[in-house]
Amino acid sequence: VEDKAGNVSHSAPLTVTVDTQTAINSIELVNDTGIPDDNLTNAVRPHFRVTVPDDVNAVRLSIDGGKTWVDAKRTSAGVWDYSWLTDVTEGAHTLTVEATDVAGNTVKETMSFTVDTTLSVPLIALDSADDSGVRGDELTRVNRPTFLLDNIDNDARHVTVEVQHGSTREVLKATQGANGRWSFTPAGDWADGQYTLTVKVEDEAGNIRQSAPLTVTVDTQTAIDGIELVNDHGISGDNLTNALRPEFRVTTPGDVNTVRLSLDGDTNWVNATKNAAGVWEYNWPGDVGEGKHTLTVEATDAAGNTATRTLEFTIDTTLSVPVITLDSADDSGNRGDNVTSVRSPGFTIENIDPDANRVTVQIAHDGSSREVELTQTGGRWHFTPDSAWTDGSYTLTVKVEDNAGNIRYSTPLDVKVDTHTSINHIELVNDNGVPDDNLTNEMRPQFRVTVPEDVTVVRLSLDGSGDWVNATAGATKGEWNYSWPSDVGEGKHVLTVEVTDAAGNTATKALDFRIDTRLSEPVITLNSADDTGVPGDG
């Protein structure tokens, strides 16, 4: 400033800044979840960060078109933050940011953002084409099964399947097909066992949903543990029976739900029934023919796996009736009368089939019985007592059992063991004179022999001549008679009697007798002392 006097004076310098504008450098949705910087969040209380020049001294925000404003807070030079204090509704929103600097300049910027908190819960199911057992039982015999994923929202960006098998866990990616449907198929074959699958879906907003776990069992095989012919008779386990209606028992794993059987080469099938113990049984309702048969068994488990096994078996209902006879060499009496004088007689057993596995003889004697098992020797069946039998009657019955369990009995054979006989009495029937003195005046003596009733032959011989004559059985049992047909000479004689019984036993006895046919003619005279007249005149 200069006055009239010419004085000049200077003020202190004044620096003035002309600032006619400000700016908003950036607006950031801090809790942008999911894909970064897509301004999509699942946070219902979004957090914003505004970057502005350092001279900005006020930042405010509005999401209702400027009707309502909230003030951001400066957190560092040029950085302002605000977290919404109340829930922001789902959907698209426009954020308006207004910044004011110290010069009073203002600027506004907008940012579109979306709040998305919804995501459907995914579903996973075994593909029906691979659900090989009962539909919906989550059991499959496919070792690389396909799973269908449903309820997958269109904004899903990650779809994975977690597979837990034993202690092994892996996370695998699902695949979206050309038709838009999601599915999952393992890259390699799964071993048999249980698998638990859980689907995890993440959308663009970062929402995550998991399906309920699905437990699936992979079962690619089954088995038939055993087939048993229940009415296997005879030798156990040889699959030989005499039952025309065989009964079978099939043992399988517990998950088998169908067992069927066939006897005609798989043309016709019948279904077995599972008992309370988990074993499958079937009794053939009609007669099955004699001979060899092949049983085919097919088992199907819950996963649809099948197993087949066969059993060869034979039905044998035939067995010959055995025959027992006394050995002819020991049939010592009349042939075929089964009476023997042998105390350890031999018996021949015939009509024994080749498949006989047990042959026994039951011997009944005097109210008791015992059984002896026989062994075939030299192709023959034979029985001889191991100790001498006492005299008496014995009944022998042969029992034969074959490999199929058939049993046949012989007709009982009654045998009598008789090892001795006797001559009870020899009588000279025409014993004249003094009784029983065996003195007769008959030139043709008559004899009576008393013997046991089983004696079949009585013969007589005189004086050791070696000539024998046969007596004749009398009307009374045990009495035999013989009258000599020709004259026997005077004097002493010895009669020899030999008897033979039905068993062939013999006994001999002798009788001494005498024939006396002579007697002098007697003479009588008067004693001479008393002959008083002429001597000799009587």
Description of each model-found segment:
Residues 46-52, 145-151, 246-252, 345-351, ...:
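Aromatic/hydrophobic beta-strand junction motif of beta-rich domains
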Residues 78-82, 180-184, 278-282, 379-383, ...:
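Short strand-edge motifs at loop-to-beta-strand transitions and within beta-strands
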Residues 84-92, 186-194, 284-292, 385-393, ...:
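Surface-exposed, short loops/turns at beta-strand junctions within beta-sandwich domains
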